[in-house]
Amino acid sequence: MGKEYLKPTVFISGHRDLTQEEFDLYYGMQLDWLIIQEEIEFVIGDYDGCDTMAQEYLTEQGFDPSRVTIYHMGDKPMNLVNKRFKTIGGFKNDIERDSAMTNASTYDVAYIRKGKENSGTAQNILRRFTF
């Protein structure tokens, strides 16, 4: 039995210490193209850095918040830029949460710095190809 059909859903991930310049360079144009796609949805974590910048970017662009889901550990997100975003929580650790986002998505938008090939962001991309 195959994987059930998922709407085109993008998992945005990246470094916690991502600069605004890096976000604009490595994410901005991709997100600009993606947000005009009719059925696209996004899944994002709730950490500082890339996660929060992505939440802010989608909000600033007027993207429909009902098509954004924030995944978090524990009872509530650490960072939730738009209270209209959906949330899914209760995960015990980063790997469990990130695995759930991989399973809920069909594409990745991510940037991995040179020397950070073993980062959580890199693991998120590799996970897509091991299912």
Where are the regions that the model predicts?
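Acidic/glycine-enriched connector segments
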Residues: 2-8, 16-131
